[in-house]
Each structure stands twice: as C-alpha cells, then as structure tokens.
Amino acid sequence: FIGELSLGRTPNPCVICNRFLKFEQMFKFARDFGCSKVATGHYARVRHGKDGSWSLLKGRDRAKDQSYYLSFLKNSWLSKILFPIGGFEKSEIYKMAQKEGLDFLVGKKQSQDLCFVDDKLRRTFIDKRLRPQSGKILSVDGEALGQHEGSHNYTIGQRKGLDISDGQGPYFVVGFDGDDVIVSRDEKDPSLYSNVVNLRNVNLASLADLDSGASISVMAKIRYQQKLSRAKLTISGKSGKLEFSSPVRAVTKGQIAVFYKGEVCLGGGIIK
C-alpha cells in the first residue's frame, strides 16, 4: 500500500488484501486443520457450472454486493469457498442476527478502505512511512493557488481537502506534474474523462483463460461506487485494455477496474 502511494498511485487495499492476505492465509489455516473449504461473510456468490467451471457472482443484495472486492481471487479457489450470506439481502441477515440474540452486530460500523487504521489517524500512519514531498497546487493555467505537504494525499477527481482558500472554488484535482498537484474549477474538465483504461496485473476470477488479443463485450467500472458501463475488454497476458462506449470520469492509477458479464464477475485489473 505504502509502496504504491510512493509511486504516485491511489491503491485499493481491500482488493489486494482479499487476494494476498485474507484468503491465502485462510486456506493455509484450513489445510492445517484438515478443512476442505473456507467461508466468509462477503455479499457474493459462487456457481458451479454444468461444464465443471466455477464462477464468481454478484451478491443478491446489489446495494451491498462485494464481488468487486473479490475480483482478484484465483479461479481455482472458488470451488473451496462458501459465501453463506451472499444469497440474502442484508436486511434479512440483520433479522436472523436479532433472532439469534446477536443484536450487537446490527448497526455495527462497517470498516472502509484502511480497516487497520482509524480514519482520524490515516494521514499520520501514511506520513510516518513515507517521506512526503511538498509542492505547489497549480491551476490548469499554471497559476499557483496553494501549497501541499505531499501529493499522496490527493487523487484524481478529488474535491475536498485541497487547502485552497481563494474563494473561487470548488476545485477538482485533474492531474499531477512531478510533486505539483493540478486542479481545475471545471467539474467536467476534459482531462478528467477518458474512453480507454489500460490495465496491469489482470486477474480472471471467472474465466480460466481468454485468448491473448481477443476482445469480449463486458460491463465494467473503475471504482466500487461507480455504475457499470459498456466496454470492450482486450487482454494480452497480464495486461489489458477497457474501451468504454462512453467516457468514464476520474480514471486513477492504482485503482481497480472490474468487469462483468451479466451477474458474473469475470475479474479485474489495476489501472495504469
């Protein structure tokens, strides 16, 4: 996470954590205890096809669907995973919990992003592990609007916390130039939009393979909260490209793009 920030990227720790920490460690524990499967409380599902294939599916509760965060799971793992609540609405799970006397779980605050660091301590945690480089906050025309204490505190499309007090805002982060942060007053600045998103470290959670250079039509998104948009996916090895039918806003290096076919989460890749 810190390494990605130091390279000027905005990482998604949850996706990487699920792949390399949570599930890998759970499978190790399962083997040690002689268990053949692991179960988690994610709102997602797995499906065993008639042809023997396994697919990762969206959770039934689409508002709480977490397949996005599971897009980097290995396809070979799906046969060993159980998602017992994936076929329920969250409201149904709460009712079950209350019925079993687990009221303390209902309404419990959900962890977001860096679950291992309190939101109030996030900046301190990062600054202790990085050597922040101060720089200027510049308008798209090159006008100096302020100073910052580290470009890692900013991301494409960001509006709040920009430390600009000229009274002319709001401003939006549209890019970086070395240690300088570039902002625009135009929420629809052209530099915020792109039809093409290039990917690295592509993972196919529900596709055992895809012919190199072949293209398929998918629905995709470049962040969890974004609505799915039509796109053409082309994969070559671990690299990929999404060509969206309509421009998508705030394409951010280090974030995860995830692609779907119907309710099947095909996989994802890191935006480069």
Which ranges hold each PLM region?
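Nucleotide-activated chemistry modules centered on ATP-dependent adenylation/adenylyltransferase
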Residues: F1-C265, I270-K272
